[in-house]
Amino acid sequence: MSKRRRKVLPKEPVRCEIETLSHDGRGIARADGKTQFVDGALPGETVMAKMVRTRSRFDELRTTEVLEAAPDRQQPPCEFADLCGGCSLQHMSADAQIRFKENTLREHFAHFGGIEPEQWVAPMRSPDSLGYRRKARLGVRYVKARESVLVGFREKRNSFLTDIDRCVVLDPRIGERIEPLRELLHGMAAFDRIAQVEVACGDDTAAMVFRNMDDLVPDDREKLIAFGQAHDLHIYLQPKGPDTVHRIWPESGGRDDERLTYRMDEFDLTMAFHPMDFTQVNAGINRNMVHRAVEWLDVQPGERVLDLFCGLGNFTLPLARKGGQVVGVEGDDAMVVRGRENARLNDLSNVEFHGADLHGDFTGQSWAKEGFDKILIDPPRSGAEEICKYLTAFGANRIVYVSCNPATLARDAGVMVRNGYRLVQAGVMDMFPHTTHVESIALFERSAD
């Protein structure tokens, strides 16, 4: 059987007239009856672009020259922006990025839910568009042909790692240490046996978790410790699964000691987390997001509040500070433990945490048989369609939905509206500047009978 012959791509760039943007931030043009998706192009622009992939119904191209620039174009703040997949919109002005995200949410509400909020709220802008990212997973790869180690994000639409020596969107405690990190790894005996580096930052401490596929020789451990000392970083190893993560610098006093923290001063809370725990990447947006969610729910003393997909208590504990009785439910048992730890740390007794598979049947659990006045829901990208069908049984008169996927928010909003709730307010939050990621928040209220 003969192999399918790969199509030969044109070597010369082609001229593209950009009409609009796709939801993944690429410019859309049309030629010879086919759609063209053009990386690095903006609506209204004329660009020259090189073909990188062709399909029967569309082509994928990369901008090589801008002939006529749009007013929304800006000089990317990062020299690696054209190639690195960590960001996709650095060539677009901040105002245009916000408009793009608002339009994406509007289109999804119309397409998937067939609804629109009674009021669009002003977008929540990130206090910082650079140096904001406190968590990331950095790939590590030894390139034999170059005899060097690369550390960073994948190239755009490619499995190769980008050759970078710094990152301007990462917290500077990490982003300014990419080159020293590369030098460290290149000098280790295990230079080709470190798969990735997880990075996490609290308010006062930054950490790196090295995924070592083999046991490290003593000299490599000493080099990692010296790196942590020199750059004021906590250093962890992960020889196998997540349960094997342990700190080697500073010396650990036990797993309870291996915590980073962030403050929420508005609520007089200190939140502790392990470097591998899920936390919001943008501290400024997180503070404003929690403030808005608490404000919208308007919890009164004595009210019962349910926080679904509660994690380590990022919303749960601020809600408890308002005097209600708060129940947090989470599918990850480790995060349930973390939520309880944080409640004790902050001396809160009007809150409880439960573990449950929120994508399965949880109706038999004791907490699910009780009524609630207010509900907060912050699901993963897959959303919470089945839960939304059940929410009316809790009897809540107000629900705040925090979303990291506009498509599933719109779908779930449609379910809630059909089950007797009004979509009162909604808006976007710029949790990830310079990317197409759309974080949003919506308020639902029970319709009058």
UniProtKB/Swiss-Prot annotation:
Does this UniProt record's set of keywords contain Nucleotidyltransferase?
Answer: no
Q: Where does S-adenosyl-L-methionine bind?
A: Q280, F309, N314, E330, D357, D378
What molecular function does GO assign, one term? iron ion binding
Disulfide bonds, paired cysteine numbers: none
- This entry's Enzyme Commission designation comes to 2.1.1.190
**What's the top EC group for this one?**
transferase
InterPro entries referenced in this protein's UniProt entry, alphabetically: 23S_rRNA_MeTrfase_RlmD (IPR001566), MeTrfase_TrmA_AS (IPR030390), MeTrfase_TrmA_CS (IPR030391), NA-bd_OB-fold (IPR012340), SAM-dependent_MTases_sf (IPR029063), TRAM_dom (IPR002792), U5_MeTrfase_fam (IPR010280)
Reactions the enzyme catalyzes: uridine(1939) in 23S rRNA + S-adenosyl-L-methionine = 5-methyluridine(1939) in 23S rRNA + S-adenosyl-L-homocysteine + H(+)
Any Pfam family matching the protein = TRAM
- Active site residues according to the UniProt entry: C404 (nucleophile)
SUPFAM superfamilies of this UniProt entry?
Nucleic acid-binding proteins, S-adenosyl-L-methionine-dependent methyltransferases
Please verify whether the record's keywords include Zinc-finger. Answer: no
Task: Give the keywords, sorted.
Answer: 4Fe-4S, Iron, Iron-sulfur, Metal-binding, Methyltransferase, rRNA processing, S-adenosyl-L-methionine, Transferase
One GO biological process term: rRNA base methylation
| Record Gene3D superfamilies | 2.40.50.1070, Nucleic acid-binding proteins, Vaccinia Virus protein VP39
Pinpoint the TRAM domain residues.
7-65
Residues that, per the record, bind [4Fe-4S] cluster: C78, C84, C87, C167
**NCBIfam families this protein is in?**
PRK13168.1, rumA
**Listed PANTHER family:** 23S RRNA (URACIL(1939)-C(5))-METHYLTRANSFERASE RLMD (PTHR11061:SF49), RNA M5U METHYLTRANSFERASE (PTHR11061)
What's its job? Catalyzes the formation of 5-methyl-uridine at position 1939 (m5U1939) in 23S rRNA.
Per the record, the similarity remark reads: Belongs to the class I-like SAM-binding methyltransferase superfamily. RNA M5U methyltransferase family. RlmD subfamily.
Q: What is this protein called?
A: 23S rRNA (uracil(1939)-C(5))-methyltransferase RlmD
